[in-house]
Curated annotation (Swiss-Prot):
GO terms for molecular function: DNA-binding transcription factor activity, RNA polymerase II-specific; protein dimerization activity; RNA polymerase II cis-regulatory region sequence-specific DNA binding. Disruption phenotype: Root-hairless phenotype. This is bHLH transcription factor RHL1. Expressed in root epidermal cells.
Length: 386
């Protein structure tokens, strides 16, 4: 080995640099006894050689070879220089280079020659490729985690941008039944129909005696009921302001529009505001018994409890009005007819009307009290009809 290096570098004399090597080796720390027997070149299988102990190992080997055989001093120096050149400059040891055998070729000889020309400069100049730093595995995992996190967080970011300021209010998820569409347009349309059905049901509950199921008939009942309520408000307002004489033309016009103001028959105002003609033959005889029963029941309730009577009339869709107003309406729209209820109900109705004034509550039931002048005595009697 010594002859090989002397042939490659004839100008290199190892014996002339003993002082330099001894000075260089003296700076290397020793972690164990340098006098121990380390002449064996191979490491046992059960002993692990650590890369960070390489300085001490080489120092001990060099001293051992210097003591035992002075002729191998140059070979030890060359071995030391080769190991030093193979080590990274930034103390980061590549585990793959640890098991590589030293190459005593031309590259090693050139490195040794450059070492003696300038030891410090050769370490920094001959191995610039050793100064790169590998990112640790933990950082790479973090970078990958950030990348995957960014991709996973992209859809919520787009959804929040589309939502605008409704982030604080979470929209309830609507589950579609089997066979229903799940696209947003179909869901919105289904919710709209459900809201309409709920509003229609609530509106139907406000109308008394509403028993229609289809929407068209139900809306017709609601329209008629609203018209009747408007008429009642107008009549009561005008009766308070201008008396019964001012109300009679209005009621006559509305009754003629309703088709029930024809002469000859009795006029009964229904719950929808129209005036219906009553036949004096068979229809009057069939409804007389039921009307008499209802009138007696109302009279009994008014004698016992006025509040219960008002609630009963409200359930029938009827109301009470002043006798003077009923007289004006009866005179303008109907002919003279026989009374249908006893006189005590007329007196109670007059008492409830508070001497010609309107109902005490706007929520009072809708009972059209008509009066008729019977005979020559001109006695005012009230007529109740559901």
């Amino acid at each position: 080995m010594n002859n090989h290096h002397q042939q490659l570098n004839p100008q290199f004399d190892p014996t002339s640099h003993d002082d330099f090597l001894e000075q260089m080796l003296s700076t290397l720390p020793s972690f164990w006894d340098p006098n121990s027997d380390l002449s064996a070149e191979t490491t046992p299988d059960n002993v692990a050689a650590f890369p960070f102990d390489e300085h001490s190992t080489l120092n001990s080997k060099f001293r051992n070879h210097q003591i035992t055989s002075p002729t191998t001093k140059a070979a030890a120096a060359l071995m030391l220089q080769q190991h030093l050149l193979q080590m990274p400059a930034n103390d980061v040891v590549d585990p793959t280079n640890f098991f590589k055998s030293p190459n005593p070729g031309g590259e090693a000889s050139a490195s040794v020659q450059a070492l003696y020309n300038g030891f410090t400069g050769s370490l920094n100049g001959t191995q610039p490729q050793q100064h790169f730093q590998h990112p640790p595995q933990g950082n790479s995992n973090q970078i990958q985690g950030q990348n995957f996190g960014a991709t996973n967080q992209a859809p919520p970011a787009s959804g929040s941008a589309g939502g605008g300021g409704n982030q604080g209010q979470a929209k309830p998820r609507v589950r579609a039944r089997r066979g229903q569409a799940t696209d947003p347009h179909s869901i919105a349309e289904r919710l709209r129909r459900e809201r309409i059905a709920e509003r229609m049901k609530a509106l139907q509950e406000l109308v008394p005696n509403a028993n229609k199921t289809d929407k068209a008939s139900m809306l017709d009942e609601i329209i008629d009921y609203v018209k009747f309520l408007q008429l009642q408000v107008k009549v009561l307002s005008m009766s308070r302001l201008g008396g019964a004489a001012a109300v009679a033309p209005l009621v006559a016009d509305i009754s003629s529009e309703g088709g029930g103001g024809g002469g000859g028959g009795d006029c009964v105002t229904n719950g929808a505001g129209g005036v219906l003609p009553r036949s004096t033959t068979t229809a009057a005889s069939t409804t007389n018994d039921s009307l008499t029963m209802t009138e007696h029941q109302v009279a009994k309730l008014m004698e016992e409890d006025m509040g219960s009577a008002m609630q009963y009339l409200q359930g029938k869709g009827l109301c009470l009005m002043p006798i003077s107003l009923a007289t004006a309406i009866s005179t303008a729209t109907c002919h003279t007819r026989s009374p249908l209820i006893p006189n005590n109900l007329a007196n109670l109705a007059a008492a409830a009307a508070s001497n010609g004034e309107g109902p005490s509550s706007p929520n009072m039931s809708v009972l059209t009290v008509q009066s008729a002048v019977a005979g020559n005595d001109s006695t005012v009697k009230d007529v109740s009809k559901p």
